């Protein structure tokens, strides 16, 4: 048994998944193909589907016109080892999109992402509740997450 997330794009699916795959090491687009039968979304050939991998996570996608737009109930979380990787990914994904609090952003296609340092999970799960409160307070003041201030908050 395999579990795979599936994304519904109104348009520009191939551009979106190609862009995502170019940003994350170990990613690739496996295939993009038209659905050669009439569907509720359009005539044969007008709807396309795809398979792609981001890092070690496989996804499927469809480009089938408007349905429900992406929203915060689904996001892709990327944990970055370094601030440089976090900054690079954040800056690329936010181009043409919008940024939000605590490392969240929406890309130009409306898909929500959480770009976070790997270290954040370690800091947030520390057994010292005072440390966790300080880290949380620091994080809540940030839009793009920054490892150094989070580490400083943890240190007190």
Residue ranges of model-derived segments:
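Core segments of cupin and vicinal oxygen chelate
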Residues: 7-56
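Short hydrophobic/aromatic beta-strand micro-patches
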Residues: 8, 77-79
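Vicinal oxygen chelate
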Residues: 30, 51-53, 60-64, 68, ...
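A charge-rich, low-complexity, intrinsically flexible signal that marks solvent-exposed coils, linkers
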Residues: 40-41, 72, 155-156
């Amino acid at each position: 048994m395999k579990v795979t997330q599936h994304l519904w794009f109104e348009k520009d699916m191939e551009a979106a998944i190609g862009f995502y795959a170019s940003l994350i090491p170990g990613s690739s687009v496996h295939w993009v193909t038209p659905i050669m039968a009439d569907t509720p979304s359009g005539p044969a050939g007008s709807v396309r589907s795809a398979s792609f991998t981001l890092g070690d996570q496989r996804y499927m996608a469809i480009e089938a016109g408007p349905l429900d737009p992406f929203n915060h109930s689904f996001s892709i979380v990327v944990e970055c080892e370094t601030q440089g990787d976090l900054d690079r990914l954040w800056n690329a994904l936010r181009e043409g999109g919008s940024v939000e609090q605590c490392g969240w952003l929406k890309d130009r296609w409306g898909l929500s992402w959480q770009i976070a340092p790997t270290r954040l999970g370690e800091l947030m799960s520390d057994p010292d509740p005072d440390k966790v409160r300080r880290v949380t307070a620091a994080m809540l003041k940030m839009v793009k997450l920054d490892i150094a201030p989070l580490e400083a908050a943890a240190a007190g």
